Amino acid sequence: MPSPFVLLEVDTPSGPREVKVTNPEKTYFSGLAAGQGRKIDLVEYYRSVAQGVVRGLFERPTVLKRHPDGAEAEAIYQKRVPENRPGWIETATVRFPSGRHATELCPVDVAHVMWAANLGTLDFHPWPSRRSDTESPDELRVDLDPMPGTTWDDVRTVAGVVREALTDLGMSGFVKTSGSKGLHVYCRIEPRWTFTQVRRSALALGRDVAQRIPDLATAAWWKEERGERVFLDYNRMARDQTIASAYSVRARAAATVSAPLLWAELPDAEIEDFTIVTMPPRFAELGDVHAGIDESVSPLEPLLELVERQERDQGLGEAAYPPQFPKMEGEPLRSRPSVAGPAAEKRAAADARAAEADADRARTSPRPRRPTTGESKG
């Protein structure tokens, strides 16, 4: 028997689009009241914050984190856009650290977002670069990841120091909740720099913040060195490393979302304040509180100068990349400090090769298709 569906007409700058929503009554969020956590509610949520979510995704290659069986079920990270898609869906081609390529979704309007939500996409993970030049990021992202033993107050405090550090450098930061445990601070930059340069700048910023509040913040890559502190994850600026976009829904029973904030709101903000139920009325009242981000372009040169000063005055050079990356120029031994040595170097190299091979297989091996009605089981 064919799955039930509804057809939604969506206004876009290119004209009306029709988005098919299959199984609209399917429960996606068990922590919400009846009639609030269905698949149709997820899709309509994205329509309600259209201007904001599109601002964060516009012209960016985007990875889809799909939960076709609901928020508490298995996740699928989909880098390649499905072949079975409407003709109006736009795409972008990107290159991975392995040298392989993929064609990813490239949202240009809310119809793209709603179409992906019908596939079970909860959160959207865009590249920090645009389709016109995928090799040059136009966004510096600071990911504040709280380690066990830290509190939400700690995360907010660290975010405030990130803002201070950016201000000292003549840069403007925009803060949002992750929708999960942490906070993100975004800076628009000119697309003139490579991923290597922008990542290195993120590392320098993380180290600067950690030096200002060493008991609360760390930029140490190895978990054994982080302690009970907030980790500033500089590797989120490495190629093909992404984080959930503004207004993305997270895989939690309560359907929390990644909420853009005004800095004045941060001291009182809680992750649980922002859900697919509470965000639409907030958006209707305030609009997108990050509406000015595209016009607030910060210079990256002060951070690049900080990189040079840290190297010259403190001997702080490169730091480890994620395991799926090949050995990078200037990178130290990619092995935990507690097991460092010649044997560890060989193990680290072997682990990196294995991780890269696994990542390539994951990207190129198609997932077995679910029975569908032409769109999605989700």
Question: Where are the regions a protein language model picked out?
Answer:
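Flexible loop/turn segments at secondary-structure boundaries
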Residues: Y28, A71-E74, N84, T150, ...
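Short beta-strand
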Residues: L64-H67, G173-G179, A220-E224
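Short, conserved phosphate-binding/catalytic loop or strand-edge motifs used
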Residues: T177-C187
